[in-house]
């Protein structure tokens, strides 16, 4: 797909994820666009038994594409298959054509936001020891109970994507283990270090309201394509392969250059309070290697405390 990146066949994907594991990456993530890409959960299930240490996440699972009770069953099974390595990224969906293709209504944003809370209630509820019932606005379950539960307890870590200051960041504080946003419209439109700091100041206030330590939220970032090379010739070849659609969609947010360019880019975001980067490498092994060997070891934790 022109925007979702290079789609790898299974043998190529397995080799790429295993390479990422050997390079020391913490996790590998999959989008949830079932008519555009292979199913994220099928691929995670396959990787659960063919990798050993790397965590496997969704960036992000749309709550409308699978009923939350069914999703709870799938996540619990795959978490068990992987030995407790699943991260459940959740979102409310924003790609109207995909909803149309799947024959699904596209409710207004407030309805989808409330549905996210219902979905998390169901996930949490059916993973407990007792049957769980919820009569929600969007989702309903009656005396539902998932056994065996996930390996990770009390639940699989949940990430909520988005940067909305009135609702989404409040939901992160109330329900999630991790936040996530990025610089383009589909990932929160959070542009630059000052905007990142603003979002975290707001998130910190919501954490205070629910009596939760701000530090208990893992602050993650969805990074648009990163294209790195050791030589100018290699970089020119990679830049030439970037599609017009990618240029239009990601524009100046792409990180193109050397390890030094990437270090400067990511260190600024670390200094703004980000802790964890989910990086789109365009399935390029050299970019992944440069990130692992030259960029990641060089980044240092925030040099100054967040002004919250």
Which residue ranges define each predicted feature?
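Active-site-adjacent structural elements that line small-molecule/cofactor binding pockets in enzymes
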Residues: 1-308
């Amino acid at each position: 797909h022109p925007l979702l990146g290079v789609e790898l066949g299974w043998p190529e994907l397995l080799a790429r994820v295993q390479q990422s594991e050997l390079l020391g990456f913490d996790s590998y993530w999959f989008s949830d666009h079932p008519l555009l890409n292979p199913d994220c959960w099928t691929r995670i299930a396959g990787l659960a038994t063919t990798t050993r240490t790397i965590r496997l996440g969704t960036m992000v699972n749309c709550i409308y594409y699978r009923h939350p009770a069914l999703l709870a069953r799938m996540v619990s099974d795959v978490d068990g298959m992987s030995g407790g390595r699943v991260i459940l990224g959740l979102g409310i969906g924003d790609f109207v054509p995909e909803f149309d293709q799947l024959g699904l209504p596209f409710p207004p944003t407030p309805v989808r936001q409330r549905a996210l809370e219902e979905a998390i209630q169901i996930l949490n509820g059916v993973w407990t020891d007792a049957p769980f019932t919820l009569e929600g606005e969007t989702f309903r379950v009656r005396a539902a109970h998932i056994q065996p539960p996930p390996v990770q307890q009390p639940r699989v870590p949940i990430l909520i994507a988005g940067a909305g200051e009135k609702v989404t960041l409040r939901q992160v504080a109330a329900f999630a283990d991790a936040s996530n946003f990025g610089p383009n419209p589909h990932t929160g439109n959070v542009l630059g270090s000052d905007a990142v700091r603003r979002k975290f100041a707001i998130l910190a206030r919501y954490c205070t309201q629910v009596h939760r330590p701000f530090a208990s939220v893992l602050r993650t970032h969805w990074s648009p394509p990163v294209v790195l090379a050791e030589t100018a010739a290699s970089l020119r070849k990679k830049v030439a392969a970037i599609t017009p659609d990618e240029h239009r969609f990601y524009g100046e947010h792409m990180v193109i250059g050397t390890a030094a360019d990437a270090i400067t880019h990511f260190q600024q975001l670390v200094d703004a309070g980000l802790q964890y980067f989910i990086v789109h490498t365009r399935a390029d092994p050299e970019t992944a290697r440069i990130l692992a060997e030259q960029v990641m070891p060089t980044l240092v934790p925030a040099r100054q405390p967040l002004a919250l």
